């Protein structure tokens, strides 16, 4: 049984005040495309005949589930008082051969009979990827259905007058449909219905709460900001859960409060992130001791483009696409990344080398692509790579694990995805490594890792602040002097200082299980069993990389003197004139790069 409907309000067609925006929040681009496809051919037939314009036959809407593709079509159909026929895999698929094709023919015949000069007829095909999948993954029945649909759409010839039938289809897997459907003459236009941004989420929340009583304390703007990655269906479920929470509290006066939305948000999450752990970290800048200058740089690079995006657009500034944090192990690189994500209220996707290196061919690359796709849908978002040197190690380095084919494929995929961030908004790649020399040079250029920050071991003041952070929930004895302990823990990293505080508490409990405070003797006992893993030589090595990175931005690439001369003189005399030309060119090149050669030989 086909789902057939006309506009339920006969007076809507004559009421110019009602528009689809009354029931749809955001998605202006898709709304305009649908209006042009459905309404324009019937509103401007004379202009079309004058210009010889042939209107498109079909429009394909694609995007994640729950973004409102079906609602968009229904709203525009209602706005223009069109006749609508809805086809779905459930309504088309039949048990016996030939019956599915008959359903399609009947639908197009019914649409043609209702199409008149001033009233369009629309066929909406939902989940078209199920009806017409790619040819390498379909059954015999799918072949027959696809062939019948091709025939029916091709018979719906466009002309200078209005088309007989307008075909609109939707899918959340645009790459899974038959490519023959996407060619010109069938689905001429493809329009993405993307995940709503902050402004669109606010409009959707206002639509779903316009008939309920809201407490003055409810800030829909703040709720919209906190709902990264939520689609329209998720926001509808959020409002429904908030109403249920309010009804449980009091059935007499149904007033939604901020607490109701907080409870609802703990129940309803973004559907695009189901199956993976994606959350905004609860780590704040206060949880990171010291590193004031570094935190300020991260705030400017991560927070500002998200919180002040309008200012960046106004100034014509492109936000950074990647930031690399390098430094010794245990110096709070991961904590800094989480604090930046929390401050920017961005979704946080964390990937480690263990997740990306799989025994199955192509699985790691698929996970990488899928993570970037989910990050685009849940923007603003941060993708964090821990131990980035394993995934992005130098190609051709025989001593590295990345010399394998798997590592090279992962690196190629990462480079491709990072280059694709130029068109995406609100996505930042954060990476951390304690082997910056091992990172492939292709990633170290601007446009990929635009900012390279050195996370040094904590100095005296930073160690004091770190000790304060990790002892703020502990009861300390009067004889505990954290500043003195900081002076005694030179070369200790943040992770080692955290371990020192934890071990001190454990020593206190070993002494007396009923202990209520930690005293200085406990810290001294714990410190005697802990040794810093860092050495002065290692710290100097990390510092030298930072200095070398700064020099490489301003100095020309050094040339090896031996290699330059041997390239010229290695040719034999039999090459005649060609060898003389090469020799002259080499001498000219050598003389004009003498300074660079001296620098190279000195280093």
UniProtKB/Swiss-Prot annotation:
- Report which superkingdom the organism of origin falls in: Eukaryota
Role = Probably functions in cell division and growth processes. Interacts with certain SNAREs as part of specialized membrane fusion events where vesicles from the same organelle fuse (homotypic fusion).
Amino acids binding ATP: 63-70, 327-334
Q: Which keywords belong to this entry? A: ATP-binding, Cell cycle, Cell division, Cytoplasm, Cytoskeleton, Nucleotide-binding, Nucleus, Protein transport, Transport
What's the protein name? Cell division control protein 48 homolog B
Example GO biological process: cell division
Which InterPro entries has this protein been placed in? Answer: AAA+_ATPase, AAA_ATPase_domain, AAA_lid_3, ATPase_AAA_core, ATPase_AAA_CS, P-loop_NTPase
**What subcellular compartments does it reside in?**
Nucleus; Cytoplasm, Cytoskeleton, Phragmoplast
Among SMART domains, the record links this protein to: AAA
Q: Which taxonomic lineage does the organism of this UniProt entry have?
A: Eukaryota, Viridiplantae, Streptophyta, Embryophyta, Tracheophyta
One cellular component term (GO) for this entry is: phragmoplast
Pfam families per UniProt? AAA (PF00004), AAA_lid_3 (PF17862)
Q: Which residues cross the membrane?
A: none
Say where the protein is mainly found: nucleus
PANTHER family with a match to the protein in the record: AAA+ ATPASE DOMAIN-CONTAINING PROTEIN, AAA-FAMILY ATPASE
| Family per similarity comment | Belongs to the AAA ATPase family.
Which GO terms label this protein's molecular function in UniProt?
ATP binding; ATP hydrolysis activity
């Amino acid at each position: 049984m086909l789902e057939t409907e006309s506009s339920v309000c006969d007076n809507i067609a004559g009421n110019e005040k009602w528009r689809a925006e009354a029931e749809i929040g955001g998605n202006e681009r898709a709304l305009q495309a649908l209006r042009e496809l459905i309404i324009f051919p019937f509103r401007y037939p004379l202009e079309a005949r004058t210009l010889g314009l042939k209107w498109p036959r079909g429009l394909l809407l694609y995007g994640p589930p729950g973004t409102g593709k079906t609602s968009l079509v229904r709203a525009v159909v209602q706005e223009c008082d069109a006749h609508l026929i809805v086809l779905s895999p459930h309504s088309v698929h039949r048990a016996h051969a030939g019956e599915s094709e008959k359903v399609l023919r009947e639908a197009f015949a019914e649409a043609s009979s209702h199409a008149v000069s001033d009233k369009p007829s629309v066929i909406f095909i939902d989940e078209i990827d199920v009806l017409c999948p790619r040819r390498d993954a379909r059954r015999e029945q799918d072949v027959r259905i696809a062939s019948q649909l091709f025939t029916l759409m091709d018979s719906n010839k466009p002309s200078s007058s209005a088309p007989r039938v307008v075909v609109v289809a939707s899918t959340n897997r645009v790459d899974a449909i038959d490519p023959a459907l996407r060619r010109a003459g069938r689905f001429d236009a493809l329009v993405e219905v993307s995940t709503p941004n902050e402004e669109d989420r606010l409009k959707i929340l206002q639509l779903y709460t316009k008939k309920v009583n809201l407490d003055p304390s409810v800030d829909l703007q703040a709720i919209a900001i906190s709902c990264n990655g939520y689609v329209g269906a998720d926001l509808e479920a959020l409002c429904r859960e908030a109403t249920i929470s309010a009804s449980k509290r009091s059935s007499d006066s149904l007033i939604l409060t901020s607490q109701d939305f907080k409870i609802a948000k703990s129940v309803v999450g973004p559907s695009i992130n189901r199956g993976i752990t994606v959350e905004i970290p609860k780590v704040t800048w206060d949880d990171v001791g010291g590193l004031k200058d570094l935190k300020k740089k991260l705030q400017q690079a991560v927070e500002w483009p998200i919180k002040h995006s309008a200012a960046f657009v106004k100034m014509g500034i492109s936000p950074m696409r990647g930031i690399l944090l390098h430094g010794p192990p245990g110096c709070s690189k991961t904590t800094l990344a989480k604090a930046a994500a929390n401050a920017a209220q961005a979704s946080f996707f964390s990937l480690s080398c263990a997740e990306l290196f799989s025994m199955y061919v192509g699985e790691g690359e698929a996970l990488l692509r899928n993570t970037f796709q989910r990050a685009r849908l849940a923007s603003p978002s941060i993708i964090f790579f821990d131990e980035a040197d394993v995934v992005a190690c130098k190609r051709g380095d025989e001593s590295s694990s990345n010399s394998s084919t798997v590592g090279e494929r992962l690196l190629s995929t990462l480079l491709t995805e990072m280059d694709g961030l130029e068109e995406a908004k609100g996505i930042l790649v954060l990476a951390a490594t304690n082997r910056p020399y091992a990172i492939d040079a292709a990633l170290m250029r601007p446009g990929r890792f635009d900012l390279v920050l050195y996370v040094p071991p904590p100095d005296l003041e930073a160690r004091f602040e770190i000790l304060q952070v990790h002892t703020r929930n502990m009861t300390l004895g009067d004889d505990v002097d954290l500043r003195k302990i900081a002076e005694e823990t030179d070369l200790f990293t943040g992770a080692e200082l955290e371990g020192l505080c934890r071990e001190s508490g454990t020593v206190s409990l070993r002494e007396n299980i009923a202990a209520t405070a930690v005293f200085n003797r406990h810290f001294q006992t714990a410190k005697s069993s802990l040794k810093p893993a860092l050495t002065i030589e290692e710290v100097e090595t990390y510092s030298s990389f930072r200095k070398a990175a700064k020099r490489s931005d301003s100095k020309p690439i050094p040339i090896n003197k031996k290699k330059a001369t041997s390239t010229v003189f290695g040719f034999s005399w039999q090459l005649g004139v060609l060898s003389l030309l090469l020799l002259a060119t080499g001498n000219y090149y050598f003389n004009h790069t003498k300074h660079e050669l001296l620098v190279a030989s000195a280093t």
